[in-house]
């Protein structure tokens, strides 16, 4: 295995696609992999609701315990699957705080704090940091689309406002905004941007991100059906919807 990795296509800027399956100290990556919030499968958590439309915190507590007990590597609260875009501001903030409190440092908690309003994304991110999240998942601006340079400035503003790690979130099918590989390269130079959730579905683009950024921007699959190909491109893991149902897979 070691000889194959040295002599084959996977050079020092890449990693073994079987890294997640073998605990080989010789394959521990350098760069920002050492700063990664988690490795493996994090759950893009649903937000349980009561019939009257209020968040069901009793069920959320049960769900969090179920995830932790069955080996989930991280909890992602208020992401796309958690319907963050349809939560009120109070619901959004309360859900983040409750999750941090109930997880109680058993596994990392990552909060979705993105917005199409840069200042509001900064405020959400600062609040999430203040209540103790381990990292942030920050989607691109949506509806109000910007240029690639605008994206860089948007993420710089957020990253400069907090001290905790940030995972970029690229899902152009929902936002209408794509983070190009070249923009990923620029963003990877920012110290506390430590990964990207890539849900574009474009393996060619993901391959180019891996090639340009190497270990300075670990990639998480944002689509459950692309876990294997992304692992083969040295992916860090997955932020999974399927894990809501079966986190032990």
Give the ranges of each region predicted by the language model.
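Active-site beta->alpha loop and helix N-cap motifs at the rims of alpha/beta catalytic domains
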Residues: 36-43, 49-176
